[in-house]
């Protein structure tokens, strides 16, 4: 019965789950064995097969992001993987995040985690929080829990591609190669997007495009064998 539940979880994940390898109990999450060049904490020099998804957007100044939970250029820890999507040991705990050096004129932040390698044709957004006040410069670990009580007042978690207003951990298909998880803090020149929690990540990014004035990114390249 346990195996069947894992198979169902992988199906619900639309190919983002761990697939047959985990259903059989043979899959394992590992750090990249490929050469990955990264400047710690700013995500500015990664080598990857696909273009940086932010390269297609208007250029904005970068600022610094860091974390006591995840490291730029290193795999996601197991706690940041998705038990919801069937990864054994995955806990769907959002990482601790802090940031500094953002542009003057910042009025709010959006925090997100995105996997451009997900086999959907449009990637997969694991987490989005909008309307984070400019006075907030950190989020504690597990701030992305369902019905979180540790997000700052006024912040809103969007439903995300999993259809749940919470952080959903990584769960790439076993054997699909490296997936680069972009954990991004976006600085906006508006205090609120005015968008509800049901807004898709794509629509949010479209609506805030002209309001983005800075961006900080931590990239975690990870694969499941």
List the predicted regions and their residue ranges.
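Short, flexible coil/linker elements and helix-boundary hinge sites characteristic
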Residues: 4, 15-17, 211
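Bacterial N-terminal signal peptides that target proteins for export
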Residues: 2-10
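N-terminus-centered regions that define maturation/targeting leaders and the start
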Residues: 24-225
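Bacterial N-terminal signal peptides
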Residues: 9-20
